[in-house]
Amino acid sequence: MSFKRPCPLARYNRTSYFYPTFSESSEHSHLLVSPVLVASAVIGVVIILSCITIIVGSIRRDRQARLQRHRHRHHRHHHHHHHHRRRRHREYEHGYVSDEHTYSRSSRRMRYACSSSEDWPPPLDISSDGDVDATVLRELYPDSPPGYEECVGPGATQLYVPTDAPPPYSLTDSCPTLDGTSDSGSGHSPGRHQQEQRTPAQGGLHTVSMDTLPPYEAVCGAGPPSGLLPLPGPDPGPRGSQGSPTPTRAPASGPERIV
């Protein structure tokens, strides 16, 4: 009976079948590692792109904010410069106008200072008693009011005759005078005469009624004086038997003379 001895090569081959070699294990590990590397590479690229996007966005935002700030500063500077220029222009115009007024005033003063004495009107000819020449006044004041000769003189051109009698008045008190006008229809009463008489203690003035004064005809004569126009009014009363004019009583409401 014979026994067969196994071949060591076959045994080696059998064991190599169950236990892979180093080359086979390296090939299997290479196939397992490749997807991990690809995934990590993709993740890294995504992260890098995200960081780049964030950095670029922040830079762009900072640039826009800087441009907007610079634009706002430029606009404010331009507005301030325009406002300052307008204010300077206004001050220049105001100064020019004030300088023009000052120049006009100074030129007027210089003209007045440098003008000769012939340009000035002649001085007033005032006499010792205070009278002023009418011709000088007429030359100096062409629009002056008319004088006495122009109103009541022989060549009167501006005659003015009052249409009604002036109301009664008094410098001290007008109430008794007004009370007396209501009694004008009842004639002259002693009470009214006593009210009209004022004591000299009241400022040194006293009123005298027109009834106590002589008429105009008794003082100046019956005929009108030469150089005066007759005033409208009642005719002088009839003369008495002695040749003296009969005094006519003035109306009770006539004016009072202050003496």
Curated annotation (Swiss-Prot):
The keyword Transmembrane helix applies. The keyword Membrane applies. The chain crosses the membrane at residues 36-56. Residues 71-89 have a biased composition (Basic residues). It is found in: Membrane. It comes from the Eukaryota. Keywords: Membrane, Neurodegeneration, Spinocerebellar ataxia, Transmembrane, Transmembrane helix. GO terms for cellular component: membrane. It is a single-pass membrane protein. InterPro entries: BEAN1. Residues 171-187 have a biased composition (Polar residues). Residues 71-91, 152-259 are annotated as: Disordered. Residues 221-230 have a biased composition (Low complexity). Interacts with NEDD4. It is linked to Spinocerebellar ataxia 31: A form of spinocerebellar ataxia, a clinically and genetically heterogeneous group of cerebellar disorders. Patients show progressive incoordination of gait and often poor coordination of hands, speech and eye movements, due to degeneration of the cerebellum with variable involvement of the brainstem and spinal cord. SCA31 belongs to the autosomal dominant cerebellar ataxias type III (ADCA III) which are characterized by pure cerebellar ataxia without additional signs. This is Protein BEAN1. It comes from Homo sapiens (Human).
